[in-house]
C-alpha cells in the first residue's frame, strides 16, 4: 500500500505541475488563469477534475476549428454570389455615422456579417407578446422554420410551441430545431423523439464522437443563442428563451426582425446546425431571399401590447416623445405599442463562437464604451466584466460620461448575486452608477449610448459570454431605436434602487466576505 500511495502521490505531483504549465502558457486572460491556479493549489484533486472538465481553453482547438471549417466549406460551395454580397458586402457601411464605421469593421474582422439596411424592427419587452407573435409567425410559415434555443423548458408555453412545430412539420414545412444539451439535461429523450416522429429535424448541441471531448465541450462551451428564422423573411433574437418564466417572473428584451438582417440570423443558425451535423439542402439560395417586402415600421411592444398604438408624428420621428409617453405608463404594465413609420434600420448581426479568433462581442462592447461621449446605459443579469471591460467603464465614467448599469436585486443563481456585487465598489468609486432592479428578474442584455448605438442580444456582461459560449448580438445604428431603448431603460429605473458608495461601505461583514471569496473565482462562473 505504501508503494501504491507513493506512486499515486508522484503521479499527482507531475499531473499538477504539468497542468500548471499548461495554464501558464494558455492564451486566455490572466484572471481566469489565476483563478484556476488558485483552485488547483487549494484543492488539487478537485481542481484538476474541474479543470479538465470545464477549464481547458478550446477557443483555438482543432476540434472547433474543424467544425467551423466544415461549415465554411459547405457555405462556400452552395451559396451564390448574391448571398455572399448580402452577408459580406461593404456597400451599406457608408450609411452608418462616420464615428461608428470603425466599429462595423471591427465586428466583421473575422468573417462576420456586415451592416444591412431595409430592416423592420420590433423591440419586445413582454413574454406574452413575444409568445403571441412567434405563434402567429410559426402558423404562417410556408417553407421552413429554423429554431435554436438555450433553454426550451418543459412547461405550458413550450408545449404549445412544440405542438405548433410538429403541426407545421406534418404539413410539409421543413422544421429544424437545435437545443442546448446541458441546459436542457432534465428533459428526457422521449420529449424530442415525439418531435422527430412528427417530422421535426432535431439536433442537440453538441455531440462529439469521443466521450472525453463530449464531457469537456458540453460542460464548458454552450449554445446560449435564442434564434428563430421563418422562411428567411422573419427572424427573432435577443434574451428570451422558451419558458413560462417570461410571462410573470422575468423582464427581458427581444427582437422581431424583418428584412435583410434576417440573413445574418440565418447564417448563424446554419453554422450551428451544420456544426451539430444537421442535414441541410443543397440549394442555399432559398435560405437567403432578398427581402424586397421588408417591414416599413419600427415597433416597440411591451406588456400586453394590444390596444394602445401610438404613431409618432414627423416632429417626433426621432423618437424624442417616447420618454414622455412611457412616463405616464405604469411600470407594472408598460402596455404601449410605438410605431415609427417608414423606418429603415441599419442592423449588423454579430455572432461569436469559441473558434472565433478575436471575440467580436467582447471587443465590440469595449469599443462602444470607450467611444461614448454622453451616456451609456447597460442592462445585464450577470455583471462579471473582464478587466478590459471594467477599465473601459471606469475610464468612461471618469471622463464625464453618464455610465449606468442595471442588474437584478435578486439573482436567479445563488452565487451570481455576490459575484455581481463584487464589482460594485470599483465601479462606484469611478463614478459608474449602479441600479438593482426589484420585482421581476431583469434578464435583458441591452446597451444603448449617445442616442445612436444600440445592442440587443443573448450575451451577458461576463467572462462566459465573452469567451466560452455561442452568442449573438444585434448592433443597431439608428437614432429612433436608441431613443426607444433609452426610454425603456429609464422606465425600468422606476422599479430599481440606486446603489450608493456610502450604502455599499455599510453592508454587513458577511456580505463583504462572500463577495470577496466569489470574486476569486469570477472568471470561472
Region annotations inferred by a language model:
Residues 1-363, 367, 371, 395, ...:
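N-terminal localization/anchoring segments of enzymes in phospholipid and broader phosphate metabolism
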Residues 150, 180, 381-382, 416:
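Glycine- and other small-residue-rich loops at beta-strand/loop junctions that grip anionic moieties
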Residues 382-403, 408, 413:
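Helical hairpin unit composed of two closely spaced alpha helices linked by a short loop
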Residues 387-391, 417-419, 449:
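Histidine/acidic-residue-rich catalytic or RNA/ligand-binding cores of hydrolases
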Residues 434-438:
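Active-site donor-binding acidic/aromatic loop of nucleotide-activated sugar
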Residues 445:
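Catalytic-core elements of nucleic-acid end-processing and repair enzymes
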Amino acid at each position: 500500500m505504501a508503494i501504491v500511495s507513493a506512486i499515486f502521490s508522484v503521479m499527482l505531483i507531475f499531473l499538477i505541475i504539468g497542468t500548471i504549465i499548461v495554464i501558464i502558457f494558455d492564451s486566455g486572460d490572466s484572471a481566469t488563469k489565476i483563478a484556476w491556479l488558485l483552485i488547483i493549489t487549494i484543492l488539487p484533486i478537485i481542481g484538476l477534475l474541474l479543470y479538465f472538465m470545464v477549464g481547458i481553453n478550446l477557443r483555438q482547438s482543432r476540434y472547433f476549428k474543424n467544425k467551423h471549417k466544415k461549415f465554411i466549406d459547405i457555405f462556400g460551395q452552395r451559396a451564390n454570389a448574391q448571398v455572399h454580397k448580402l452577408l459580406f458586402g461593404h456597400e451599406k457601411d457608408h450609411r452608418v455615422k462616420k464615428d461608428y464605421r470603425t466599429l462595423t469593421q471591427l465586428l466583421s474582422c473575422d468573417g462576420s456579417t456586415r451592416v444591412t439596411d431595409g430592416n423592420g424592427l420590433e423591440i419586445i419587452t413582454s413574454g406574452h407578446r413575444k409568445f403571441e407573435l412567434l405563434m402567429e409567425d410559426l402558423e404562417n410559415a410556408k417553407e421552413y422554420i429554423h429554431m435554436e434555443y438555450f433553454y426550451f423548458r418543459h412547461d405550458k408555453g413550450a408545449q404549445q410551441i412544440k405542438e405548433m412545430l410538429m403541426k407545421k412539420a406534418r404539413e410539409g414545412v421543413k422544421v429544424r430545431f437545435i437545443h442546448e444539451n446541458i441546459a436542457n439535461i432534465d428533459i428526457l429523450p422521449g420529449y424530442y423523439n415525439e418531435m422527430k416522429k412528427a417530422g421535426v429535424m432535431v439536433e442537440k448541441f453538441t455531440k462529439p464522437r469521443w466521450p472525453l471531448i463530449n464531457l469537456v465541450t458540453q460542460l464548458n462551451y454552450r449554445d446560449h443563442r435564442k434564434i428563430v428564422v421563418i422562411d428567411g423573411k422573419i427572424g427573432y433574437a435577443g434574451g428570451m428563451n422558451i419558458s413560462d418564466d417570461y410571462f410573470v417572473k422575468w423582464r427581458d428584451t427581444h427582437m422581431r426582425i424583418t428584412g435583410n438582417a434576417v440573413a445574418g440570423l440565418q447564417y448563424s443558425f446554419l453554422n450551428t446546425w451544420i456544426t451539430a451535423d444537421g442535414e441541410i439542402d443543397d440549394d442555399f439560395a432559398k435560405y437567403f431571399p432578398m427581402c424586397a417586402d421588408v417591414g416599413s415600421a419600427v415597433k416597440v411592444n411591451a406588456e400586453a401590447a394590444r390596444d394602445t398604438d401610438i404613431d409618432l408624428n414627423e416632429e417626433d420621428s426621432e423618437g424624442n416623445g417616447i420618454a414622455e409617453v412611457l412616463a405616464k405608463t405604469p411600470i407594472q404594465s408598460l402596455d404601449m405599442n410605438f410605431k415609427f413609420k417608414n423606418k429603415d434600420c441599419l442592423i449588423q448581426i454579430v455572432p461569436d463562437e469559441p473558434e472565433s479568433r478575436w471575440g467580436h462581442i467582447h471587443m465590440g462592447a469595449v469599443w462602444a464604451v470607450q467611444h461614448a461621449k454622453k451616456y451609456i446605459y447597460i442592462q445585464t443579469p450577470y455583471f462579471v466584466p473582464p478587466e478590459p471591460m471594467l477599465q473601459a467603464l471606469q475610464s468612461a465614467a471618469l471622463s464625464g460620461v453618464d455610465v449606468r448599469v442595471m442588474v437584478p436585486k435578486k439573482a436567479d443563481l445563488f452565487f451570481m448575486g455576490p459575484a455581481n456585487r463584487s464589482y460594485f465598489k470599483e465601479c462606484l468609486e469611478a463614478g459608474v452608477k449602479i441600479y438593482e432592479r426589484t420585482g421581476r428578474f431583469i434578464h435583458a442584455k441591452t446597451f444603448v449610448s449617445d442616442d445612436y448605438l444600440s445592442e440587443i442580444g443573448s450575451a451577458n456582461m461576463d467572462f462566459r459570454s465573452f469567451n466560452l459560449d455561442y452568442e449573438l448580438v444585434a448592433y443597431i445604428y439608428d437614432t429612433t431605436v436608441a431613443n426607444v431603448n433609452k426610454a425603456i431603460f429609464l422606465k425600468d429605473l422606476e422599479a430599481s434602487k440606486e446603489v450608493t458608495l456610502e450604502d455599499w461601505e455599510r453592508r454587513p461583514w458577511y456580505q463583504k466576505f462572500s463577495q470577496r471569496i466569489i470574486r476569486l473565482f469570477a472568471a470561472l462562473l
